[in-house]
Regions:
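Conserved single-residue anchors adjacent to enzymatic active/cofactor-binding motifs
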Residues: 1-154
Length: 154
């Protein structure tokens, strides 16, 4: 008969509550907190199947092997929260593999597509993340200074 694996999380959570007991009046503990109500879904994932091939179209020049695209429809806009959500998708996509480092982080790009220039989001990236935003051509902006190459397409 196969043994059930020992559940260590409840013991760890109890130990944390004991350790922080003097602060219990203003701490809230949420065990196994769900990050989303809906399934995580990347709007579009473009995988380059042939290494070393370069896309000449301006929209795909930044592409590496795994390219995560976030699209905002005509009545929506790219927000600061969208930036963090898509970065989270990229990191989760990288980590959700069978073997460690199966998807190298340097093989991932992010493209954020919107009808309008995301002024507030890009200001946040410049000021908080110290990224640089460079207009590559009409409607295509590269964000540099991040671990993952990012382009904004408007």
């Amino acid at each position: 008969m196969r043994q059930q694996p020992l559940q260590w999380h409840p013991a760890f959570q109890a130990a944390m509550q004991i350790e922080l007991a003097e602060y219990q009046d203003w701490l809230k503990y949420e065990r196994e907190h769900n990050l989303t109500q809906n399934p995580l879904q990347i709007d579009l994932l473009i995988i380059k199947m042939e290494q070393g091939r370069q896309i000449e179209k301006s929209i795909g020049r930044l592409f590496r092997r795994y390219n995560i695209i976030e699209y905002k429809g005509p009545s929506d806009y790219l927000s600061i929260n969208d930036f963090y959500k898509v970065c989270g998708y990229a990191f989760f996509y990288k980590a959700d593999t069978v073997t460690e480092d199966e998807i190298p982080i340097e093989e991932i790009t992010i493209s954020l597509v919107s009808r309008a220039y995301p002024r507030k989001m890009l200001r946040h990236l410049r000021e908080f993340w110290k990224c640089r935003v460079k207009k590559m051509e009409e409607g295509i902006y590269y964000v540099t200074g991040s671990k993952i190459p990012i382009q904004v397409i408007v």
